[in-house]
Amino acid sequence: MARLFTPSESKYYLMALDAGTGSIRAVIFDLEGNQIAVGQAEWRHLAVPDVPGSMEFDLNKNWQLACECMRQALHNAGIAPEYIAAVSACSMREGIVLYNNEGTPIWACANVDARAAREVSELKELHNNTFENEVYRATGQTLALSAIPRLLWLAHHRSDIYRQASTITMISDWLAYMLSGELAVDPSNAGTTGLLDLTIRDWKPALLDMAGLRADILSPVKETGTLLGVVSSQAAELCGLKVGTPVVVGGGDVQLGCLGLGVVRPAQTAVLGGTFWQQVVNLAAPVTDPEMNVRVNPHVIPGMVQAESISFFTGLTMRWFRDAFCAEEKLIAERLGIDTYTLLEEMASRVPPGSWGVMPIFSDRMRFKTWYHAAPSFINLSIDPDKCNKATLFRALEENAAIVSACNLQQIADFSTIHPSSLVFAGGGSKGKLWSQILADVSGLPVNIPVVKEATALGCAIAAGVGAGIFSSMAETGERLVRWERTHTPDPEKHELYQDSRDKWQAVYQDQLGLVDHGLTTSLWKAPGL
């Protein structure tokens, strides 16, 4: 791509808008991938009274917050708006926005919106109970998180909005639209609607036809890193960017995070350790899981897809344990000037591998078609305080997260035949050196830890740079900009021990699911429609 301008390498910057589930960030990077400044604000999604599971996205308030973050980032960086070479946006997947025929956004929901449980059940019965299988084979998605049941819910309960709807996009595309006035979606994020064909990386309107829904609301599809438009005068006045700044198509947070980690070639594998843990494996061509346990999403790299298996609430479980049981450790850590998790890891490092047989029951491996979990619990506790204490439970949680990751990676290998030679571990979890080593020991693979552990915004900035003509290739730039902090090598003896722990945990977990099935305990989480 020809350059849109000829920047001095030390003078120009890239801005990424990162719209997560709980916050919006505007992050400024230099052209070597160094983070220069950030503006951040939390946002809250709106539960609609008398609509169980609803979680609407506040379009007006959240656009104001996005603009404030852009102004804050520019202020914190101390740079003039004309030195922002381009801007792009990424967001949580599954969140959707609807627009009327005048281009006004009229309704949106966050990724966690679960109002359409009844519609999921209805849709599963279509085509002699084969509709969900057809959706999955074409798109890599099941109905639980897709846009189809949400649109059907609107048709049933908010026909005023459904009739007005002229276009659908994802939240990242909405941010780009608010900046530029141009509507389009990218495959990586739109792929999570359950409406985008994995093979052709374009919409499959027949799926909406089969569901009895309108197929005339699908917006143009443009690849990540494509120039979409420029910042309008109206947007510039609100957000502080210069009129005419290039606005580039962004994408889904996980896929752009992989770009920022240099995970851009077939068979490369990442474990992204946040609130949820995503185990992601790059596949050279679209293929889906015959068992429907794993989701498959378009990568931001054209032609490539990612098999993704998700561990539920892994980071949230660790936060719960810290906040519920470790008040003393929080005070000690504060006095020492260290993070509480660092102190807990130091304590846990003195517990032997296997954590004296304690088995946490929280997330199961992903079972995308029938996705639910057992009730949270600890199994096989001892009343010996030397063996069963906070340090033991904390180590057991870290070991269990790694075991669930290994199970998720195994089920990807089962259908893809890809067995990775190493892992990239990123996100908040990778800050823990003990946790990183446990992941290496459980998986039996070398685990590489990047310097930039929250790489989503960096991947988004790379896309902005490609769209502006600064970088020639997303994949090559991702590989060039990633830097490594450390590598953890697996211990063969501990790996063998953890194999035994994994087998026992899987057997116990199945029994715990049976308690949920019989109504005796309450699932940690259950997908809509189950």
Curated annotation (Swiss-Prot):
- Which Gene Ontology MF annotations are present? autoinducer-2 kinase activity
- Report the top EC class in one word: transferase
Cross-referenced Pfam families: FGGY_C, FGGY_N
Xref: InterPro entries = AI-2_kinase, ATPase_NBD, Carb_kinase_FGGY, FGGY_C, FGGY_Carb_Kinase, FGGY_N
Which keywords fit this entry according to its UniProt record? Answer: Cytoplasm, Kinase, Transferase
Q: Which reaction does it catalyse?
A: (S)-4,5-dihydroxypentane-2,3-dione + ATP = (2S)-2-hydroxy-3,4-dioxopentyl phosphate + ADP + H(+)
Major localization class: cytoplasm
Kindly list the biological process annotations in GO that this record carries. carbohydrate metabolic process; quorum sensing
Q: Does the keyword Membrane apply?
A: no
**Where in or outside the cell?**
Cytoplasm
Instruction: Spell out the GO cellular component terms annotated for this protein, sorted alphabetically and separated by semicolons.
Output: cytoplasm
- EC numbers: 2.7.1.189
Under the heading CDD domains, the entry gives:
ASKHA_NBD_FGGY_AI-2K
Q: What does this protein do?
A: Catalyzes the phosphorylation of autoinducer-2 (AI-2) to phospho-AI-2, which subsequently inactivates the transcriptional regulator LsrR and leads to the transcription of the lsr operon. Phosphorylates the ring-open form of (S)-4,5-dihydroxypentane-2,3-dione (DPD), which is the precursor to all AI-2 signaling molecules, at the C5 position.
NCBIfam families found in the cross-reference section: PRK10939.1
Q: State the family named in the UniProt similarity comment for this chain.
A: Belongs to the FGGY kinase family.
Which HAMAP family does this UniProt record tie to the protein?
Answer: LsrK (MF_02053)
| Protein name from the UniProt record | Autoinducer-2 kinase
What is the species listed in this Swiss-Prot or TrEMBL entry? Escherichia coli O157:H7
What does the organism's lineage look like at the top?
Answer: Bacteria, Pseudomonadati, Pseudomonadota, Gammaproteobacteria, Enterobacterales
